[in-house]
Amino acid sequence: MISTTIFIISSLAAVTYGRSHLTVPVGSTCTLQGPQQGYVTWWRIYDNGGFARPCDQPGTKFSCNGRDLTIINITSNEQGFYYGTNYKDSLDYNIIVVPATTSAPRKTTFSSSSAKASTIPKTASAMLKLQKIALSNSTAAPKTIPKSTIGIITAVVVGLIIIFLCIMYYACCYRKHEQKGDALLNFDI
């Protein structure tokens, strides 16, 4: 789970400078183009850091064709960040929804292919930072083992030893008295 999150966040860090900002009026339809090759997986990134796959959501609000994501009849709920990746290349969009009466400002688009050379060192440093964050957020092993844990482990070990000794005792006693039949296996009716 952590590796998937690190992959998604590091991919987002790699395309931060290649983000396309789109201003879309309410009620329109917008198509986000994904990378050219391969099957594209689309993610929606929420302000609280959560992720969702719009193509997997029920309803007819989002339409996916394997490469492009089409958002139909946009409302203010669809405003936010959308990220498409084929796990080799990726594109990132910031959709800003404006009222239908407001004229849309000029669209500024940055190509992710032109930003690749400059983002490689930044991506590497971002990935290292993400790995450090993931390791620091994980629960560190305590230096001392709690007494309750020691008690539980001791009880389990003692129980297993008692069961083992009972089995050994039964096996040894049964061999000494071979003429005796096993009462549990004797089915004389």
Swiss-Prot record:
Protein name: Early E3 20.5 kDa glycoprotein
Residues annotated as glycosylated: N73, N137
Keyword set, alphabetical order: Early protein, Glycoprotein
Function in brief: E3 proteins seem to be dispensable for virus growth in tissue culture cells. They are potentially important for virus growth under special conditions; E3 region may help adenoviruses to evade the immune surveillance of the host.
InterPro entries given in the database record: Adeno_E3_CR1, Adeno_E3_CR2
Family in the record: Belongs to the adenoviridae E3_20 family.
